[in-house]
Amino acid sequence: MSLQEHRLSNGFRIVTENMPGLASASIGVWVAAGGRHETPQQNGIAHFLEHMAFKGTKRRTALQIAESIEDVGGYINAYTSREVTAYYARVLQNDVPLALDVIADILLNPTLEETEIEVERGVILQEIGQALDTPDDVIFDWLQEEAYPDHPMGRTILGASEGVSAFSRSDLQGFIQQHYGPEQMILSAAGAVDHDEIVKLAENLFGGMDAKPFADVAAARFMGGERRQIKALEQAHFALAFESPGYRDAQIYTACLLYTSDAADECVN
């Protein structure tokens, strides 16, 4: 294992692992700007921004963003969680500089055009409606809400229709301005990557960012609870959660092994 780390002068962090024998690489930037970093009024805005990621920048149209990666046989995507928003790509070794340039462009130069905002607003509202009609989605949102009541970790990632309907372009820009700083970002790359090359690319692309302080985030405390809903369905949907060690706890890997042995789908925080 050849894990290497570096931090730029503005706080931007880089973690790489060269994996011999591979001809491709996975690379991405993880931003500490997920659901838990939202205010109640902002609930859903991190996910909204993720939807806007590939809708155009000052240098590339939406089509150019897609074609730049697809034309070299690569894959690019993004996701939002309660902890982070991530932007990542998988490409061949020679296309790593291109992939990182596109990701940096998305992060640093989004145009957030009003027409695209309205299109994505409609898409997200449909997504919210579908989630509310899907018991598998509903029970896990309820689980979070009961585990962390009156806390950002207990809110949904998608947000509520009322809030999403009200987000403006300036709201999106304000969230970026507040949370998308170099110290809030980690560049992670694995596969056919050279650490020194990645550091040099990151310095050129992200080294000019101005540092900004972390926003205050309330500590999450597991509370627990119970919620039931009786509906006329043929199946019952059930979720049960327990407090577990955190990511930084020495017992986290033991806990993950236990979850795996119990046929759990994944190790969750």
Where are these regions (language model features)?
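Short beta-strand-initiation
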Residues: 1, 223-226
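Single conserved hydrophobic/aromatic residue that forms the stacking wall/gate
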Residues: 259-269
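Charge-rich, well-structured scaffold segments of protease-associated domains
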Residues: 7, 18, 62-221, 228-229, ...
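Hydrophobic side chains within alpha-helical segments
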Residues: 50-53, 123, 130, 268
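Short glycine/threonine-rich loop/turn motifs
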Residues: 249
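M16/MPP (pitrilysin/insulinase) zinc-metallopeptidase core fold and M16-derived inactive scaffolds
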Residues: 26-90, 261
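N- or domain-start disorder-to-order transition segments that initiate the globular core
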Residues: 1-22
